[in-house]
Amino acid sequence: MVEFEKVFDDKFDRLEGNGALKYAMALAISGRHNILIIKTKGKTSQDSLVQMFPMLMPKLSETEQVSVNSIWGMAGLEREDDMVSKRPFRFPHQTCSIEGMCGGGVHLRPGEISLAHNGMLLLENASEFRTSVLQMLRVPLESRMITLSRAGVSTSFPSNFQLAMTTDPCPCGCYGNKDRVCLCSLKSIEVFWKKFSAPLLDRIAIRFDTNSDNAFIDKEYTLSELREMIAKAQTVQYERQGKLNADLVATEVEMFIPLNDEARGVLDSAMAKSGMSARNYVNVMKVARTLADMNGVENVDGDYIKKALNFLCELPYQY
């Protein structure tokens, strides 16, 4: 059963004018998809909103609580009683080192990606992290484990985390903004986005640009409405396949996300036009399945593929 922690204030609902971003956040939580949010310069409410991701995250199951408490204990940390059922939400500073992110040290302690196990790792202003730190995320995002070695001793820690990143669209932050003028050169934009690399971005199923025209989402959602959609979507996924959509492996995607000719045609056409990778092709299918689950729809048709493509925005620099 999908349950949420009680919320005693309405600060989430008070951040108006962010209906599209709120929906994108709920979509990410519903299917446990990794998400990249491209921010709008000067709109500080977006920074406040992404810090409220925990309000959308369901409680930990008892089994999940055991593994989380065990990892935190290895790090010499203790989760207080009122935190036991809450999903970990880690947001390290941009100066975080590889050791701090992935773990290490004399006694091989877990790092941020393991402390975020069964929860979320939020990298705000991700472009300000070291390139080496960002690239280290690729393997644990795939394997859900991290293996550390020191002095001939190897230790593995679970790191099944959901990744959320925010970034400006360019060094000056104005690219794509209808109300501002971007002063960046094409070369500076290229250097800016190359910090992420194509392999890392391929592991991000949702790329949401708050500067783009999101007219397909024209509603101001409340926290209770989004929680209801998340609960509905996750319940359906667990009943159908025993896991959330982002966790489906290649052989399960075709089994649980069958596409009719119309939907397949829309997706194939988009792939031919944009040159999306095979991994992003599958990501679109998974996000479309989650969108349908949020709306209580059984089959993924062409319309849901089109909606999912809206959540895979074109980046300022194409790899």
Residue spans of the language-model regions?
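Dynamic helix-loop-helix/coil hinge segments at AAA+ ATPase domain boundaries and subdomain interfaces
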Residues: 2-22, 59
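Conserved RecA-like P-loop NTPase ATPase core
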Residues: 25, 50, 65, 101, ...
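Conserved alpha-helical scaffold flanking the Walker A/P-loop in AAA+ ATPase domains
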Residues: 26-28, 83, 88, 99-121
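Walker A/P-loop
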Residues: 30, 35-78
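Conserved P-loop NTPase mechanochemical-coupling segment
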Residues: 60-66, 74-100
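Basic, amphipathic alpha-helical bundle interface domains used for macromolecular binding and assembly
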Residues: 107-108, 131-319
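Conserved Walker B
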Residues: 119, 125-129
